[in-house]
From Swiss-Prot:
Component of a multiprotein complex equivalent of the SWI/SNF complex, an ATP-dependent chromatin-remodeling complex, which is required for the positive and negative regulation of gene expression of a large number of genes. It changes chromatin structure by altering DNA-histone contacts within a nucleosome, leading eventually to a change in nucleosome position, thus facilitating or repressing binding of gene-specific transcription factors. May play an essential role in the transition from the vegetative to the reproductive phase of development. May be a positive regulator of ABA signaling. It is found in: Nucleus. This is SWI/SNF complex subunit SWI3B. Residues 48-145 form the SWIRM domain. It holds the Pfam family SWIRM. Residues 1-42, 293-314, 360-387 are annotated as: Disordered. One of its GO terms (molecular function) is DNA binding. Disruption phenotype: Plants have pleiotropic developmental abnormalities including embryo development blocked at the early globular stage. The lineage of its organism: Eukaryota, Viridiplantae, Streptophyta, Embryophyta, Tracheophyta. Gene3D superfamilies: Homeodomain-like, Winged helix-like DNA-binding domain superfamily/Winged helix DNA-binding domain. The gene is SWI3B. Residues 370-380 have a biased composition (Polar residues). GO terms for cellular component: nucleus; SWI/SNF complex. Keywords: Activator, Chromatin regulator, Coiled coil, Developmental protein, DNA-binding, Nucleus, Transcription, Transcription regulation. It comes from Arabidopsis thaliana (Mouse-ear cress).
Amino acid sequence: MAMKAPDPGGSGEILPSTPSLSETTSGGAAAASKSAQLPSSSSDIDNIHVPSYSSWFSWTDINDCEVRSLPEFFDSRSSSKNPKFYLYLRNSIIKQYRDDHPRKISFTDVRRTLVSDVVSIRRVFDFLDSWGLINYNSSASAKPLKWEEKEAGKSAGDAASEPATTVKETAKRNCNGCKAICSIACFACDKYDLTLCARCYVRSNYRVGINSSEFKRVEISEESKPEWSDKEILLLLEAVMHYGDDWKKVASHVIGRTEKDCVSQFVKLPFGEQFVKESDSEDGLEMFDQIKDSDIPESEGIDKDGSSPNKRIKLTPLADASNPIMAQAAFLSALAGTNVAEAAARAAVRALSDVDYEADKNASRDPNRQDANAASSGETTRNESERAWADAKSLIEKEEHEVEGAIKETVEVEMKKIRDRIVHFEKLDLEMERSRKQLEEVRNLLFVDQLNIFFHTRKARKTEDRIEC
């Protein structure tokens, strides 16, 4: 909203100019009808832009929001702070700003020209600045308003005739106070287009004139978060390989994800359980590493004993394995456990030994049938190997299903505990912030009482000095 500078010789009332098309409030319509009745001023007066929500301002009257925001001038506790003195400070600051328009004024400039205590000047200056009555950026009027951004998909004619529609909530909401990402819940005010986190809402970290009852709590569901891309999963695995269980560094490596997101996604990975050091799988993983290192030629300059056990345990399955068959066998044995792998190996060796013994015995009895027995022994060996492999595979699959079920139940229980703890800590944080706010209010009241006592004592001393004189 653009307003004319006040006439020093007139009544001092703000003269609103013709509003632009972006003003849709009822105050803007009233200002337009009022400006149609008032005479047009000279063209050499600069236009001063103020926000539409500051249309309550008047040079001679005091609004209710001023009484609520600056109660020390209206509670009659101090003789030096009264409504008349407040009007003097407020109008002087606004006139000084309009005289130097479009240059912004600072608190130092105002303090040099006014005769009063620093606290009162500061309070009035911050109040006027928060409502945009001073130092309001004139270039901001050319920027699109929030309702214009919501209507960006419509044509200009539709935007002028139809009301703005609400947009879908984004998955991530940033706090307008501390600029942090709201995680579980946030507090939104549709009237002033504000979004605050729980900490800023408790601390009342919003501009003067907004009531806390105008905010509504908005739950941010976990399902609204975007799915993990392949690139983010690779970054997560890379961070876990480098930093281990230091989830702060892992979250900083995976940009745009929190520690809770990284932990939740990591336990959902199909091979996530192999990164945990379990007692029944350490031997199998070390066997896989020994087989992998033994197959690498020494000419590559790789020290087999140089790598730490932590790094060997964190290897991905079948990664850079020169012998894929042995690598797969070692990996399956690591998943199944040492007991199942040992039983399968013993059964395979026993079957091969029985086949070799029968073949040697038949060959010694009948040398003429040696070739035929060799062919049959090869076929028998293959059948026994396949049978042993099928038995071992069934045992491995059974053990794998049991392990996955146990891990899934354990992870669900732990995640439930973590969520309960997070909710509990958030409640404690809100209670602490509320207590701290009450303590600050008590301190402010104590400070005001001390100032009143000081002024009354000083006044009494002056009266006594006058009586003595």
